[in-house]
């Protein structure tokens, strides 16, 4: 295990020496600190100098990574080996964006011809829709696309479509429906016309309860207008690996886009699940997204650990979680179009590394995945930054900021960037009580007021953050960013010895929900439940359970 290694013992000793140091002093003592603790790939700059580290920290973390076999684990992923240990499958999302022409094998078969065939199928379909060659049952072109999916079949495409708003195709609007709450579906459909709407039903197994319920409701809505099952073929396509269930639903198998069991749901936006993205921004832009991710893949695969962006990012997370005892990670993009990135990364990280059992079946004796959360700046400054600056919990922050905007309000963007850089500096530097006193005295406040306010206006600082800066948010840059986080998560899972590619924790609740759904229709649906759940079931049916 992680804590049994020699490198871990050395890291613990080092932590005891460095933890009392303040980053303000580290910067004062080292004018080259930024140059030594920053990395770049193309126009993506990763500044990790505002972390509680020195050269020895990085060396010891890389020693730990080597002792835990990280380099071998990276090679195994790219080789298509079954690194998803519980399900005995590869986790080969890197094949979906492989632009090198290099073969990638699963069980002796080069999967790239199949990957490229689906990409070609997607391109043909997107071009048909965009050109107007693909028309609805009345002969009108498609104007609205509704993606019905949940989890990885929704979060990734939804986030990417928001992020790439400046690249949206002018004739196509893309909508997303994921929640089983009928409000989301009905709110989406109320402004759409059946004759110009195309539905994408996205489910690997085509058995996801929420997705199928919404898909059936959407088909009923469509059929009330179309009055003919033969019209479904022009308005419904499936993204799935289960041909038989697609046919049973009533979708022509010719309108099915497939992907494979070595594509995990939370890594599936790079597959045919990304069809909504391709329809929304065009296939050329979708392939730029893939190319950006591939560039990060190649960097991750080949760069030495000390110069490897995902590796360093992942090791810093382990440093804080397992030595400093942090329990959460804030993601703060200073870009409104990345407002859904924290939610996307919640699934990517928490579903991947929210595990307490190693691949060997042993219980871990240390903390693993953090709670991931965040909001775009500057909104977050007016919500939770108080806790980041003066709260009692140490919470590492990732800032993301583009140098240039797609929009013409240059002054607004300058204010945005200035705030991002200021927050990063403020978290690191803090403000001593003496500095707060001096500032208030310069403002002319009386001594009694200064004495009263001084304890409240000091900031401890020494709060760590990373900053990811890029020229402008483009499809290629977005692809690099998302692949960076995917690989960072894998790095941490590999060091902890857990499986970052399964999600058994979601199963029990789904099983119980199926049973409760049946019991809600029974006379006395209380058997087999605790008193609380039984009372709540009765409450649904209007029976009195409130305390008197």
From Swiss-Prot:
Keyword DNA damage: no
Pfam families given in the database record: PGI (PF00342)
Keywords annotated in UniProt: Cytoplasm, Gluconeogenesis, Glycolysis, Isomerase
Recorded GO MF terms: carbohydrate derivative binding; glucose-6-phosphate isomerase activity; monosaccharide binding
GO biological process: gluconeogenesis; glucose 6-phosphate metabolic process; glycolytic process
GO CC terms in record: cytosol
Catalytic activity, EC: 5.3.1.9
UniProt-annotated location(s): Cytoplasm
Superkingdom as given in the UniProt entry: Bacteria
Gene3D superfamilies: 1.10.1390.10, Glucose-6-phosphate isomerase like protein, domain 1
Catalytic activity line of the entry: alpha-D-glucose 6-phosphate = beta-D-fructose 6-phosphate
EC class (word): isomerase
Keyword Isomerase: yes
Active site (UniProt): 351, 382, 510
Pathway: Carbohydrate biosynthesis; gluconeogenesis; Carbohydrate degradation; glycolysis; D-glyceraldehyde 3-phosphate and glycerone phosphate from D-glucose: step 2/4
Family to which this protein belongs: Belongs to the GPI family.
Role summary: Catalyzes the reversible isomerization of glucose-6-phosphate to fructose-6-phosphate.
Protein name: Glucose-6-phosphate isomerase
Lineage: Bacteria, Pseudomonadati, Thermodesulfobacteriota, Desulfuromonadia, Desulfuromonadales
Gene behind the chain: pgi
